[in-house]
A protein has these predicted regions:
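Sec-dependent N-terminal signal peptides
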Residues: 4-13
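Lipid interaction determinants
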Residues: 17-69, 82-144
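Short, structured beta-strand-loop surface elements
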Residues: 74
């Protein structure tokens, strides 16, 4: 009985705390669940991302109401995701590079990430699309 209880506690603990990114963790279909720009919650959060084998495509509605997309290459290195934008709905961003450090839940089905772009801080919580029909661990460290 005690062994089962300890096993259950260990299982819950491993799936309740965050983990850094490793190769293959970004692969899959994702949707943005929460979004903040400079700490301000965004009303429209509809980002969709598909990532596989070092490439990703992201579509979203901007704060201005316009639809945007980008196609990027990415590389996972020492807990960081390094991104280079290969195509973007705004030409001036093609070729831009940035990095972010995803903070994953133990089941690797949701993560929070923050990055700064043009002196603006963006924070998003992403979940795998499969979380709409299966139970996934959730993480939120937002102050609301």
């Amino acid at each position: 009985m005690l062994r089962k209880l300890l096993t259950l506690i260990l299982f819950i603990a491993l799936n309740s705390y965050s983990h850094s990114v490793k190769d293959g963790d970004m692969d899959g279909s994702w949707r943005a669940i929460e979004g903040f720009i400079n700490g301000e919650a965004q009303e429209v959060v509809d980002g969709l991302m598909v990532a596989s084998e070092g490439y990703m495509s992201v579509n979203w509605t901007g704060a201005d109401g316009n639809k945007y997309f980008n196609y990027s290459s990415y590389e996972v290195d020492s807990g960081m995701v390094n991104i280079e934008i290969l195509n973007h709905s705004l030409d001036q961003y093609i070729g831009a590079k940035f990095s972010h450090k995803p903070n994953f839940m133990g089941d690797k089905k949701s993560y929070i990430t923050t990055f700064v772009w043009d002196d603006v801080e963006y924070t998003h919580r992403w979940e795998k699309m499969s979380c709409s029909y299966e139970k996934c661990a959730r993480i939120s460290d937002f102050n609301n």
